[in-house]
UniProtKB/Swiss-Prot annotation:
Its main location: cytoplasm. The keyword ATP-binding applies. Its EC number is 6.3.3.3. It is an enzyme of class 6 (ligase). This is ATP-dependent dethiobiotin synthetase BioD. InterPro entries: DTB_synth_BioD, P-loop_NTPase, SDR_fam. The keyword Magnesium applies.
C-alpha cells in the first residue's frame, strides 16, 4: 500500500493546492496517482476540492464519500444537512479500494488532523494510524506557524505515525523577516518538501504543471509510490 495522508495546521492553509501539486508532479513523472477526499464541506459556496485537483493536476482517479453544503467543520456540516458522516470503516474501504500496487494514493483531510471526519468521532489521525500511512503536513509561513506545526507533529508522534515532512502552502512573493526565519525553523522540525507560492491555485494547467514539476524532489516522490 502506497498511501500518503495530507493534513494541514488549519483550514484554508493550502491543502488542496499542495495535494494537487504533488499529484501533478507524480503524474508528470509517470506515477499512477489517485486522490481521495472522504469528506467535503462548503459545496454550496462552490468548494469542490477534487474538481480543483482535477483542474490543476490533470488527475482523473478521484474518490469521495460525503459532500455537505455549508462551509463548516464536517460534523456540524453533516448535522445541519440532516445527514451523517461516513463511518470509519467506509472511509478506510474507500482508500483501500482506490489504492493498488505501483499507485500513489493521496488522502486529503478536511480541516486539521484532529477534526472529526467519521460518525464515531474518528479523525484523520485515526485513519492514518489504521492504514499505517505517513502524513504530510501543509503549514503556513507566517507568525503562529511554529506552534501550530509542533502541535500537529506531536499529535502524530503520540500515535507513532510517521511524518512525511512539511509543505509551506502559500509562500509570499516578498517574504518578510518572519517568513524567512520561520522557513528555517520549520526545516529543523521536519523536512520541508516544497514551498508553494501564494496564488498557485489560480494558475492554469500548463503553468501549474511547470510549478509542480520543480516543487518536489523527484526521488522523494518516487519513493512514496515504491
Amino acid at each position: 500500500m502506497s498511501v500518503l495522508v495530507v493534513t494541514g495546521t488549519g483550514t484554508g492553509i493550502g491543502k488542496t493546492v499542495a495535494t494537487a501539486a504533488l499529484a501533478c508532479h507524480a503524474r508528470l513523472h509517470g506515477i499512477d496517482v489517485a486522490v481521495c477526499k472522504p469528506v467535503q464541506t462548503g459545496t454550496r459556496d462552490g468548494d469542490d476540492d477534487l474538481a480543483e485537483v482535477a483542474r490543476l493536476a490533470g488527475v482523473t482517479e478521484l474518490h469521495s464519500l460525503a459532500r455537505f453544503p455549508e462551509p463548516l467543520a464536517p460534523l456540524a456540516a453533516a448535522r445541519r444537512s440532516g445527514a451523517e458522516l461516513p463511518t470509519r470503516a467506509q472511509i478506510l474501504d474507500l482508500i483501500t479500494a482506490a489504492d493498488r500496487p505501483g499507485r500513489l494514493t493521496l488522502v486529503e483531510g478536511a480541516g486539521g488532523l484532529l477534526v472529526e471526519i467519521a460518525s464515531d468521532g474518528s479523525t484523520l489521525r485515526d485513519v492514518a494510524a489504521d492504514l499505517g500511512a505517513p502524513v504530510l503536513t501543509v503549514v503556513a509561513p507566517g507568525l503562529g506557524t511554529l506552534n501550530h506545526t509542533v502541535l500537529t507533529l506531536e499529535a502524530l508522534a503520540h500515535r507513532q505515525i510517521s511524518s512525511a515532512g512539511l509543505v509551506i502552502g502559500a509562500w509570499p512573493a516578498q517574504p518578510g523577516v518572519a517568513e524567512i526565519d520561520n522557513r528555517d525553523a520549520l526545516s529543523r522540525l521536519a523536512p520541508v518538501r516544497a514551498a508553494l507560492p501564494a496564488g498557485a491555485g489560480s494558475l492554469g494547467r500548463a503553468d501549474f504543471e511547470r510549478l509542480s514539476v520543480d516543487a518536489f524532489d523527484p526521488s522523494w516522490v518516487e519513493g512514496l509510490a515504491a
